[in-house]
C-alpha cells in the first residue's frame, strides 16, 4: 500500500468550481466569476485569467469555455460563450482578445462560441451560436467562415455545437 500526502492549497479552493480538461489534460476551473484558473498538471503551476467581467457573466448566465493548447507555437486558445476568443502566448506571456464587431473585419464571426478544436495542420475551428464556423489559419492570420445554411439566417440552422476531425482528415460538424 502506498501513502500519498495531500497538500491543501487554499488558492485552489474555488467555490462552486467547474473543471474542464484541455487537450494536454491540464485543468481549467471556472466558477461564474469570469476568472479561470489554469493548472499545469505537470509543473503544478497555477495561472489565473480574467476572461469576462462579473456583469457580463451575470448577463450570460453560464460560463462555457473550450481550451486548445498549441504546443509548438506556445499558444493557448480559449473560446468563450459571450466574450469571443482569447489567445494566450505563453512564451511572451501576452493575452490577445478577439471579439466580434459589426461592419469590421473579424477573426471570429460571433462572441458566442460553442466549441473550439485544433486540426492536424494547426488551424483552429470555432463553432458558434447562429453564425456557423470560423476557421482560423494560424500561419497566415486569415479567417474563413463556413455556414451550413444561408449566412443571412439568424436562427439555429447555423449553430455549430461541435467539430471533430477524423483520422483521414475529414471534419464532421454537429449542428442543432
Predicted regions and their residues:
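Carboxylate-rich, polar loop motifs that coordinate divalent cations or form catalytic acidic clusters
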Residues: 1-176
